[in-house]
């Protein structure tokens, strides 16, 4: 019989061999759901370096040492691929990115308790510690939050801390599931989990990453160079497994785009670009990207991101839509962030009926229909005490 901790959970077992991992997976595949978390380091690499995988079933909790010599993680992939076992995460994006990189595809049958908590009225992007405390009354020891998980050996305290991320998660999942079923909101969660099940969510197009830098120019030739060198940096950072900012900072990319250097000497004069970088393979790659962008016909050059040019939404209308969004979400006890973003409200204010999530499914019921009515003048907003009142026009 497995020993249990003071909290009533089985004591965690450290897994360091493929044989033991295979046995764990065989047992966990008989369960309806398994809670999962990871510990990793990423300060020195582009791709996360997976250090631990924590798994919890009904009667066992394991911490898999993914850095143990000779361990093969293929059995873990079998568990992740099993559509009959729900894989429960909290704030799953980074965990899923790791598994996508490791196995080439995403786990089947996902559930994210952070998404579920937003639907269930626990606010925007509620943290795991706060959610555990709200639902179970338990408080998680944070002493090892900033551990170097790549260092070995692991202490018993580190193993216990890592295990707590999946033991309490089982209880949180069950309580949230009951609440969502009772309120008829499971389908609300499903639509957002579909995004997490799409590999494109974790593989941004290198050709669009330049837009994140929000360059303050409408010069299309400069934007074309910026697009080319930003895409080069992303692919090169992935290839050599170095953080993109360590390879070449955004500020340097913007200056390269503005000056479009044509040779090594000009490139080496850019702030943040060393002579060694300019003379090496990386410098050659940058100069080739600049030259290719300079040779593009005008019609192939990018334009500034939407919102930087052209008509702007009415600030007053956007402000009213934000007030209405807050009122609708308070009434339905759902996080506003999950219903509509600021960019969504800007588009709604500008376009007759844009193709946006807020005008589809449950979001339209909660907010979208009323937002259209407000925009079209079929609804007025007033104040009744401390509450926003909607008045048919």
Swiss-Prot record:
Its cofactor is a divalent metal cation. Keywords: Cytoplasm, Exonuclease, Hydrolase, Nuclease, tRNA processing. It catalyses: Exonucleolytic cleavage that removes extra residues from the 3'-terminus of tRNA to produce 5'-mononucleotides. Its main location: cytoplasm. The keyword tRNA-binding does not apply. Transmembrane segments: none annotated. The keyword Transferase does not apply. Residues 14-181 form the 3'-5' exonuclease domain. Its EC number is 3.1.13.5. It is found in: Cytoplasm. Residues 219-300 form the HRDC domain. InterPro entries: 3'-5'_exonuclease_dom, HRDC-like_sf, HRDC_dom, HRDC_dom_sf, RNase_D, RNase_D-like, RNaseH-like_sf, RNaseH_sf. One of its GO terms (cellular component) is cytoplasm. One of its GO terms (molecular function) is 3'-5' exonuclease activity. GO terms for biological process: tRNA 3'-end processing. Belongs to the RNase D family. Exonuclease involved in the 3' processing of various precursor tRNAs. Initiates hydrolysis at the 3'-terminus of an RNA molecule and releases 5'-mononucleotides. This is Ribonuclease D.
